Amino acid sequence: MNFSKLFALVLLIGLVLLTGQTEAGGLKKLGKKLEGVGKRVFKASEKALPVLTGYKAIGK
């Protein structure tokens, strides 16, 4: 494995993320999308978990 190329790629990505934008516009949008995904997963698990626990209780 060529670690120098991998290190250069990681460094380049880090520089783009940290210095590419002076305001948090793009990163804020990404954060909002991730937050929305988390909320949807949480709501879906709230709906599914009681069904699964009820199914396990019936199987006993």
From Swiss-Prot:
The modification Isoleucine amide is found at I58. Residues 1-24 form the signal peptide. One of its GO terms (biological process) is defense response to Gram-positive bacterium. Keywords: Amidation, Antibiotic, Antimicrobial, Immunity, Innate immunity, Secreted, Signal. GO terms for cellular component: extracellular space. It comes from the Eukaryota. This is Cecropin-B type 2. It comes from Aedes albopictus (Asian tiger mosquito). The gene is CECB2.
